Amino acid sequence: MSEELITITVDGQQYDAPKGAMLIEVTDKAGIKIPRFCYHKKLSVSANCRMCLVDVEKAPKPMPACATPVMDGMVVHTLSQKAIDAQKSTMEFLLINHPLDCPICDQGGECELQDVAMGYGGDVSQYSDTKRVVFDKNIGPLIATEFTRCIHCTRCVRFGDEIAGMRELGGIGRGDTMEIGTYIQKSVASEMSGNVIDICPVGALTAKPSQYEARAWEMTQYPSIAPHDSVGSNIFIHTLRDKVIRVAPRDNEAINEVWISDRDRFSYEGMYSDDRVTQPLVKQNGEWVETEWQSAFETTHAALNKIIKANGAESVASMISATSTLEELYLLQKMMRGIGSNNIDHRLRQVDFSDQSSAPVMPWLGMNIKDLEKINSVLLVGNNIRKEQPIIAHRIRKAVQHHDANVSFVNPADYNFNFKVKTGLITDISAMTEELAALAKAATAKSGQSVASHLATLVNAATVTSDHESIVAALSSDKADKSVVMLGNVAVNHPQFALIRSLSNEIARHTESQLAYTPEFSNSAGAWLAGAVPHRQAGGEVVASSGLNASQMLDGNVKAFINFNIEPERDCSDSAAALSAMKTADFVVVMTAFVTDAMKKYADVILPIATFAETSGTYVNMEGFWQGARGCVSPLGNARPGWKVLRVLANQFDLDGFNQVSSDDVMQEMKTFCSDIQLDNNAVADSVADYSNQSGVMRVGDTPIYAGDMLVRRAAALQQTDDANVACVRINSKQADVLKLKDVEKVCVKQNDNTTVMALVIDENIADNNISIPAGLIETAGLGGAYGAITVEKI
């Protein structure tokens, strides 16, 4: 249905405008400049700065363009004396208390207040009284405050309330005593908080990690892609003297709109960590020695060749991070298969691979990211969407805000989402399949169809409650023409993932919903396309004989590892097994940007590679969209782009097809394998492994938002946030009573034969029989599987 148009006149020119639109929206579309401070296209209208006053005929006084709906026949003057006088008066009032410290302000040169003052302000102020001073607040390690500069536009307040879902900043006081603050002295904790830096029209809120490092006009801006979650947020990288100074969002309405997560904004700090490796290293007689690239390649080739001749190519395995570029993923799997091994995997945290042969060509969202705003119902399965994919959580929040979308979940904890949840099933990790079976039973009853035969026994034995029925009713409602069953990291990394996937597919099928995945990393989807899995080559072509998956590689039978961009002790599903496998292998070569103490103990050769901002490459996001990025700064020291390192190493083996001279050459080659791919999440196995739930207390080892990959772990500012301070044991009070841990501060954690001592926190969000102990941390690196039986005792 087309919208009704009316005609208005602005500065003598007629324009068609949608009925009910705000005047400032119409003038912006027409290219007519009207100054503003409080108005932002993504926020609600507050009309409190009064900078956008314009002259509307027949109105007794100037009207704010941001809050004035257009009417048919309206005549507006933006350049009349009445409008100009109103704007100049407003500008003078706004500058009364401003410190005018532009020469030392980080916002200088890109400040809306500067620009508007130059265009609409006077050259002499009538104000001669004392300016007020507002003492700064420490609101955390990410955002620097200078509230004396604040003009009370309230953009930051509305952002927290409307976008982040956490009203952490607010206006305190009235009139000349009004201040923006947190009311209670505390840090801003939202995973999207850094966006207030961009929307602040003055220098009141700036990026703390880059404070006083550079002026806006000194920096060079490069378009790039965020290298962490699978949204593929568009970013700008700002550099000075061949160094990354800061990261800012790049507008893309189809993907990230105008926002980025704090992880994407501040992770660049990790590039300059003290443990950055900048020179090839070779272990000689137990000592690490710097060497030239050619020598390092020769040493690596000789060692691998010796092992292949003695034990066969199948004794060599490779693990690669899914944050790597598509070019790196493709070349590594091509090299591995060139030497005769299919032992390559990027699914390092997954433990159940029993149905991998029937997995989709790549796990994907099943729709465009922007269409999430239109969904009517979503079931989150094993999905902490707010921390795993902050931008996707924002899209779901918009669906809830705009048309009251129904959100429900099946999770091992109440993850404190930033949107309204209608029904939440909090269950212990081993009983997730039982809850899903009950949902599948309710769904089949609703649809009148039978469940898949291999699930019949489990589903028929399930007990359906009113909560299950309400979730199914929401998914299959006539209003829910767009409903989604969305699998997250907890589901994919669950010991019974194949069963969870089959049950989720049944729920989706019987409610006519879309089965969706939110892949963990920036190239988790791309890694499947590139062939970085043991059972498929590039483009999804099935190999004749499947290699070892990531879990099987840790059994102790692999003689040589080629690790790319990973820390096995923090990236693998079983950290203890990963460390053991590395130590027992005859040879380990690591291609990495960072070196750790653990790595120095088990590795034999370390080859320094470039980080995301130092190399060109391609990322495939969760909707299957390919995006390229270029290098913005030179690799530190003697580090080299990963795809070049792989190409040269492959040449050492005299393999064919490794003569690419640019990353684009690699990409064009890979595209030839992906031209006819059909994406379908509904392809599932017709049988799954026997299901038997473990009894007793179980560990839930979610990976915290700032522990997911090598770069973000080294971002100093992010590691000072509350989301990074999570190295503790969390159980609910009921479980604490059962385990006799009430009023205990520290506990001894035992998993398999490994023990550690950690702080105990009572958290009522955790399900019964679950013990939350995060994975991906140094403190938990030696424990064992992220999901499994565990013992917690009083010290």
What annotation goes with each model-predicted range?
Residues N411-A413, N418-S450, F497-I500, E506, ...:
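Short alpha-helices
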Residues L205-Q211, V244-R246, E314, S318, ...:
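Acidic/polar loop patches that form or flank catalytic/metal-binding clefts of enzymes
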Residues I34, Y39, S315, Q333, ...:
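A cross-kingdom feature strongest in bacterial/archaeal respiratory oxidoreductases
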Residues S341-D355, A405-A413, H510-G526, A585-T596:
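A generic structural motif
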Residues K422-I426, T433-A491:
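Phosphate/pyrophosphate-binding active-site segments
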Residues I339-G340, H403, F419-V421, L503, ...:
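Short, structured coil segments at secondary-structure junctions
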Residues S2-D28, R36, H40, D55-A59, ...:
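N-terminal export/assembly segments and adjacent metallocofactor-ligating motifs
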Residues D478-D555:
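A glycine-rich, hydrophobic/aromatic-adjacent loop/helix-cap motif
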